[in-house]
A protein has these predicted regions:
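Conserved non-transmembrane functional hotspots
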Residues: 1-116
């Protein structure tokens, strides 16, 4: 039951991330929205690390792939934040060298739905 509840949180964080990214783009890619995305990604990592050992091997691979993307994204994020020391309305843009693994997200969501 606990693992299902933790996995269920991911549905919220995935949707929140998509919504926050849309707002980030719509509002000029500012630091305020980038901070919301960073917090959301940190929350995703927290959940993924809790459920990893309880998931089947193929889902563990998806978790590792998604975690890798977020790790690289977060490294770029921290580097730019340190360099710019931005205010909320400042533009905050960097290019992540690792694309978002949509299939991994989809596999994790489908795994959760199979448990419910």
């Amino acid at each position: 039951v606990k693992m299902k509840a933790e996995l269920g949180k991911l549905l919220f964080y995935f949707e929140r991330g998509r919504n926050s990214y849309t707002k980030y783009i719509e509002h000029g890619s500012t630091y305020l929205y980038a901070r919301i995305l960073k917090h959301n990604n940190d929350s995703i990592i927290e959940v993924l690390s809790k459920v990893y050992s309880f998931c089947p091997d193929e889902i563990q691979q998806d978790i590792v792939e998604l975690t890798y993307h977020i790790d690289v994204w977060s490294s770029h994020w921290r580097c730019l934040e340190k360099k710019l020391n931005p205010r909320f309305n400042d533009q905050f843009i960097f290019h992540n060298t690792v694309g978002y693994p949509k299939r991994a997200e989809s596999n994790i969501v489908n795994y959760y739905r199979g448990l419910v």
